Amino acid sequence: MPPSGLRLLPLLLPLLWLLVLTPGRPAAGLSTCKTIDMELVKRKRIEAIRGQILSKLRLASPPSQGEVPPGPLPEAVLALYNSTRAQVAGESAETEPEPEADYYAKEVTRVLMVEKENEIYKTVETGSHSIYMFFNTSELRAAVPDPMLLSRAELRLLRLKLSVEQHVELYQKYSNNSWRYLSNRLLTPSDSPEWLSFDVTGVVRQWLSQGGAMEGFRLSAHCSCDSKDNTLRVGINGFSSSRRGDLATIDGMNRPFLLLMATPLERAQQLHSSRHRRALDTNYCFSSTEKNCCVRQLYIDFRKDLGWKWIHEPKGYHANFCLGPCPYIWSLDTQYSKVLALYNQHNPGASAAPCCVPQVLEPLPIVYYVGRKPKVEQLSNMIVRSCKCS
């Protein structure tokens, strides 16, 4: 007698033949998804977190809650907890590079400082304390039409040989003729010229977004309270008027400039579309009608949901979880996926499709008591920030 699988084969062959003749269409036509009980999913997630916390703390069971002392935490413990929280917040706030923008080659453009003969230089006070560098923003916009395409901007200065050490400061010009401090540099003596570079990406991106015609920087000697001499002793190429002829031309070409690195304009629409899709995913993740793999909000109150009083800080946190289908491509050249769908119909416990899983996880700092002793711990991978199909 043939095995049961072979007995079913004659019944499946007509259906498989029909699938082969069917044009590619969405997987929803043969969806076997059942209605999801969100409350059940949340309860399972809460119980998983209960075990996760105990496991990470190497505790077989929750500590005794009768010995937790009343009142506020000791000052040293609270300071340690707050500093740990600040560190985690700082790390999570760091902007992650976008894969699309990082992939494409960057166009590099050099925009020279406006020549000293321009009328704009008459609007600032001249003296031995500072030098001024102005840039035509129309040239910047011609190089980078969209501020979001700018990857990096550097102010490059060719300093001449320097016989004494000097501390210099860089400032940005504001519209009301005030100056905003940006950065500083300690310059050491040198017998040869040397290029100086300042990261001014944020400033240039701001200029590209505004409508000003001329924007500028100021390089000044550091004003020391211990010294009355605030002369800018470092020489910057392009500010010397003693050169003539070819040497003056070379000086002019090496005068201060902005080095711009930006994604090519032809990629702008593609990057905008991908950002728009990511923004929609972020918004829709918390909608009850969302059907894709995404982050679902879940706040866990330690006392209410877990019945724990031994975790003193925080009182709860957004653990979140990933949920949603991960459809795979159905087309004439991937008909095997339809066979897998039939397989799943007859084997509901198995899964050959990709799953919705966490992509970015963040740690959770806590203060808890073991007996009457408070401890600060950082639990890794406790907060789901984004999901992916894998």
Curated annotation (Swiss-Prot):
**Which residue positions hold the site described Cleavage?**
R278, A279
Q: What processes in GO biological process is this protein linked to?
A: ATP biosynthetic process; cell-cell junction organization; cellular response to transforming growth factor beta stimulus; chondrocyte differentiation; epithelial to mesenchymal transition; extracellular matrix assembly; extrinsic apoptotic signaling pathway; hematopoietic progenitor cell differentiation
**Signal sequence segment:** 1-29
Which Pfam family, an example, fits this chain?
A: TGFb_propeptide
Q: Which UniProt keywords apply?
A: Cleavage on pair of basic residues, Disulfide bond, Extracellular matrix, Glycoprotein, Growth factor, Mitogen, Secreted, Signal
Stored InterPro entries: Cystine-knot_cytokine, TGF-b_C, TGF-b_propeptide, TGF-beta, TGF-beta-rel, TGFb1, TGFb_CS
Q: Which stretches does the entry tag as region Bowtie tail?
A: 226-252
User: SUPFAM superfamilies given for it?
Assistant: Cystine-knot cytokines
Give a GO cellular-component term.
blood microparticle
Q: State the span of motif (Cell attachment site).
A: 244-246
What residue spans carry the region label Straightjacket domain?
30-74
How is the polypeptide modified once translated?
Transforming growth factor beta-1 proprotein: The precursor proprotein is cleaved in the Golgi apparatus by FURIN to form Transforming growth factor beta-1 (TGF-beta-1) and Latency-associated peptide (LAP) chains, which remain non-covalently linked, rendering TGF-beta-1 inactive.
The molecular function terms in GO held by this entry are: cytokine activity; growth factor activity; type I transforming growth factor beta receptor binding; type II transforming growth factor beta receptor binding; type III transforming growth factor beta receptor binding
**Where is carbohydrate linked to this protein?**
N82, N136, N176
- In this UniProt entry, which cysteines form S-S bonds? C285-C294, C293-C356, C322-C387, C326-C389
Highest taxon listed in the record's lineage? Eukaryota
Q: Which residues form a coiled coil?
A: none
Q: Annotated region Arm domain: where?
A: 75-271
Query: How is this protein organized at the quaternary level?
Result: Homodimer; disulfide-linked. Interacts with the serine proteases, HTRA1 and HTRA3: the interaction with either inhibits TGFB1-mediated signaling and the HTRA protease activity is required for this inhibition. May interact with THSD4; this interaction may lead to sequestration by FBN1 microfibril assembly and attenuation of TGFB signaling. Interacts with CD109, DPT and ASPN. Interacts with EFEMP2. Interacts with TSKU; the interaction contributes to regulation of the hair cycle. Interacts with TGFBR3.
So what does this one do?
A: Transforming growth factor beta-1 proprotein: Precursor of the Latency-associated peptide (LAP) and Transforming growth factor beta-1 (TGF-beta-1) chains, which constitute the regulatory and active subunit of TGF-beta-1, respectively.
In the record, the note on similarity to other proteins reads: Belongs to the TGF-beta family.
Q: Which PANTHER family match?
A: TGF-BETA FAMILY, TRANSFORMING GROWTH FACTOR BETA-1 PROPROTEIN
What protein am I looking at?
Transforming growth factor beta-1 proprotein
| Species annotation | Equus caballus
